[in-house]
Amino acid sequence: MERFLRKYNISGDYANATRSISAISPQWTCSHLKRNCLFNGMCVKQNFERAMTAATDAEEPAKAYKLVELAKEAMYDRETVWLQCFKSFSQPYEEDVEGKMKRCRVQLLEDYRKSGMMDEAVKQSALVNSERVRLDDSLSAMPYIYVPIKEGQIVNPTFISRYRQIAYYFYNPDAADDWIDPNLFGIRGQHNQIKREVERQINTCLYTGYKGRVFQVMFLPIQLINFLRMDDFAKHFNRYASMTIQQYLRVGYAEEVRYVQQLFGRVPTGEFPLHQMMLIRRDFPTRDRSIVEARVRRSGDENWQSWLLPMIIVREGLDHPDRWEWLIDYMDRKHTCQLCYLKHSKQIPTCGVIDVRASELTGCSPFKTVKIEEHVGNDSVFKTKLVRDEQIGRIGDHYYTTNCYTGAEALITTAIHIHRWIRGCGIWNDEGWQEGIFMLGRVLLRWELTKAQRSALLRLFCFVCYGYAPRADGTIPDWNNLGSFLDIILKGPELSEDEDERAYATMFEMVRCIITLCYAEKVHFAGFAAPACESGEVINLAARMSQMWMEY
């Protein structure tokens, strides 16, 4: 391969196409209908290596260039290329897959330094809590910011607590007859008194040790209090509470419209659209008047998801008023996965998702109808059937497939997903990392990308593998800000032609090895054992990473 490329000075996209077709040629299935695959009486797609060797040995540049043109032409049909790649990669070769993986790891570590990702990792603040909680806007704690009142007065508390700057005001929802906007002038004095009293009685946050001021209040059902003593429950619920307060603080500002569209898919006219959406009267089949009342009056269980507002089901109710009963049923039965509920309980194969940020970056619509796939753990992400321009995504613990019509859209959609769900710490062997490589491989092979887009894709590969690797001082970079993360990925330096060619080869090889390993583990081909990550190699890689940080 390298001899052929160097002898005839093949570079750039032509070299990438030649490498790709050569790798999958042994398993390619060609119908020969168009006859454009024939070269010297044989099918190039099925016998590319043989044709390449013949052209090299015969020293016929014209035939070599014709061969390269055929490879480039074959890459235009990206759907066929993806299918042929997936078929080829899922059939283990007689090769040293483990050795190839190690070489890819070392090359990517070098690319991590050269691509600018290590520069950016140095600039990031240190991650305070390494147990990252993955948040998405399919769930919300927004109902709990609204003030419960009885005969014009705030309902008395039964218990108080705090999480950092947020006062937790526990009360009995049955004692309330309405819920109102916390910014109303008539209750500001009482609202401020609650903050001062919680700050006076509870000087230190029991969860984090924070000792600062209390600035906001969340009104929580008393039934929730025992579950907040469970570490995992509290970790997730507290983070959603914090995210909700950040959204609430945008009320009255320009960003409010953006948040409302992201959560509800529509923005009502008039002032304070968030409060309108939460408090306006809905046609529920029960006595509940608003979304806030419907959520607060229904208790959850030991699953933190069962206490939050399921925004996908809410949007179903907004689009189809007869489906408001789905929201009541979902919360009454304490379901935890909205996509499972739609797919299995309601026999709905699709649902709507909203991504305002991706829309701003690509110019496409923020509204998408996606196909609901399997729940995480039920089947491997590698088994999800992707056709045409589909890419895999995830809401909570459930996969879906969405259509991406351009390479830029696929790249940004995948980057947002990876930022939320994938954490690469340098030493990998878990399914999350494999999922990230698979998704990036789909973008690399299915869509025609520019050199700038492939440069961004390489930075994503580096992030998936090394983004959360400890720095020289032992701290871990904090990549939690999605906006700055996308700026780093999409606006980084563009690779030179030689760097692009080498990066493509590394990414292609890594994707091939990962899919091969996944299918080897699942199918257990005779005579092929999936390699394990040996401790010696792990130590060597960790030492190499540590040395790079020290040199840096």
From Swiss-Prot:
Matches recorded under InterPro entries: Orbi_NS1
Protein name: Non-structural protein NS1
Organism whose genome encodes this protein: Bluetongue virus 1 (isolate South Africa)
Record gene name: Segment-5
